[in-house]
Amino acid sequence: MSRSPNTLPAAILGLAIVSASLVGAVAVERIRRGGDEITVTGSATRAVTSDLAVWRLDVVAQDRDQLAATRASAAGATATRAWLVAAGLPDSAITTRAPTTFTQEEWVNGSPTGRIVGHRVSTQVEVRTPAVDLVATLAADPAALLDLGIPVVPQSPEYLYADLPAIRGPLLAEATLDARGRAEEIVGAAGARVGRIKAVRVGVFQVRKRQSTEISDYGMYDTADREKDITGVIRVTFAID
């Protein structure tokens, strides 16, 4: 008896379905036997508002004479500090760093001549304060310092969350509960139960701007935005009862 050309694909498809069913049945039976384990990843996210601002301002002066450049930079740093205090920041929140000097050499036809033509001195003033909103307001108007004749180059403020160490534990606990819930969904259909924790691997924390989907394998810490999402990830291996 000859086999119709249309019956062969149907037979193969039927065999594949039966094979898949057998594989699924074996997997379910293995879970039901107990002694197996399941590894799942859980995560938890918490929305936070930055509670610490770090703002650095570089006061730069340039002169042929190194001493003159150093004095001009120091005077500018003092004026910058006074302006910050007058704006409402406590003096204790402000730090003036040691000056950094750069020597400027003369170049002719792409080569240095060895002759010193000037000195560039930079003194950094750093603000570290919980007054996040005030720093954001001051940083939004850098012309206010330039209008005073202060040769300052302000950097973008960094917005941090100082209480991050305090919430790491609770966040990982929530992530562990999330992992257990995922495991229960997976093994529940097989009539098995999730048992004790056998192994835990804590992942990196992601501190991102609010509602961002950006992640990094090495963790990330967004400092540009005041409103952030902090996500903790944990990989848990459970015994299956």
Where are these regions (language model features)?
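Short, charge-dense linear interaction motifs
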Residues: M1-D241
